[in-house]
Curated annotation (Swiss-Prot):
<dbReference type="GO" id="GO:0005576">
    <property type="term" value="C:extracellular region"/>
</dbReference>
<keyword id="KW-0732">Signal</keyword>
<dbReference type="GO" id="GO:0007586">
    <property type="term" value="P:digestion"/>
</dbReference>
<keyword id="KW-0325">Glycoprotein</keyword>
<feature type="glycosylation site" description="N-linked (GlcNAc...) asparagine">
    <location>
        <position position="31"/>
    </location>
</feature>
<dbReference type="GO" id="GO:0008047">
    <property type="term" value="F:enzyme activator activity"/>
</dbReference>
<feature type="signal peptide">
    <location>
        <begin position="1"/>
        <end position="22"/>
    </location>
</feature>
<dbReference type="Pfam" id="PF15083">
    <property type="entry name" value="Colipase-like"/>
</dbReference>
<dbReference type="InterPro" id="IPR001981">
    <property type="entry name" value="Colipase"/>
</dbReference>
<protein>
    <recommendedName>
        <fullName>Leucine-rich colipase-like protein 1</fullName>
    </recommendedName>
</protein>
<dbReference type="GO" id="GO:0016042">
    <property type="term" value="P:lipid catabolic process"/>
</dbReference>
Amino acid sequence: MAGPGWTLLLLLLLLLLLGSMAGYGPQKKLNLSHKGIGEPCRRHEECQSNCCTINSLAPHTLCTPKTIFLQCLPWRKPNGYRCSHDSECQSSCCVRNNSPQELCTPQSVFLQCVPWRKPNGDFCSSHQECHSQCCIQLREYSPFRCIPRTGILAQCLPL
């Protein structure tokens, strides 16, 4: 008669034998990727992270890490770079500046894209055009200009 220890050992050996024969379902291909983060690549499979994306302004792809949600995200432009759409920017904010070009700009504290506004001294036609939100006519026949807010309550008053 075999003791409980021998019975348990025989059961474990039987399970190991059955497991190796069954192969635990379909066999997966071994990941033969060898490239680390930052190395040039052509396909996702070449990278240890399984993530090969455009990672700069240069038209080449590099192995990049996945996000915490296991997604491969393409490189996006930092603030100050020219853009034509919000999706091109890290901040998701592509805003027109004083020339006809648009630039990636940071989001506000409230995660909004703040449009470019004219600096003090520039000509304007409405308060919304000015960084100070203050567009007034300094003299009766002078053009409207952006001016800084003044006074204790920072009101839009002529200087």
